[in-house]
Amino acid sequence: RLKKGPEILIGTPGRIFELIKLKKIKMMTVDTIILDEFDQLLSDSQYHFVDKIIHYVPREHQLIYMSATAKFKQDKIVENTIQIKTENQQLDNIRHFYMQVKQRDKVECLRKLAQVSKFRALVFFNALSDLGSAEEKLQYRHIQAVSLASDVNIKFRKIFLEQFKNDELTLLLATDLVARGIDIDSLECVINYDLPRDLEIYTHRAGRTGRMGKEGYVITFITHPEELKTLKKYAHVQEIILKDRELYVK
């Protein structure tokens, strides 16, 4: 398909740059580059690949940045900004909980939740480096969990998603950036292994559950009093009823 010259090419900046270097694709006819979730690309240190890609396209081109969670300070890299506003609302069928837990007990809490609640959950991490360790510890404790790290190739990612949809996996571990392309209509639960860095990210994560009129759950792990204050601020702004959920961990 690449040899035929596709009209639209979709991929991560790193992968596209790799194909350019391998001379698998030619960029001389490209007139538009779209960066979806560009704020996440910036925070994930992938933007240097974008700079490299731009050197291979014609000087006359259009660069479009798209994001649902970008901060205004990032507008300085964009000439023209268009904001599309939507109603700020939370579905009534999503229930929000928090659990106060020590950092070292987070994995054990995941294990207990998976065993007691019998649900499938998408677990969000702030740091990509934490995925592998959590996956290894959960699997050692006989929990069907896999991580969607950035180094997992597309073939295995599709396999993991199908297994998750078919109830063959219990926990799917991911960062916000890696989870962008995941679409699961019947997801029962979202777990914030780490407190989201801002309200927009919390809302985006919560929106993964409670779809198609089904009841959904959002559980956030809290390790410090300041985190609880921040979470309660999120709840106040979004008019969320936030409840404490206790779980005994040996």
Q: Where do the language-model regions lie?
A:
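Conserved helicase RecA-like core
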Residues: 1-250
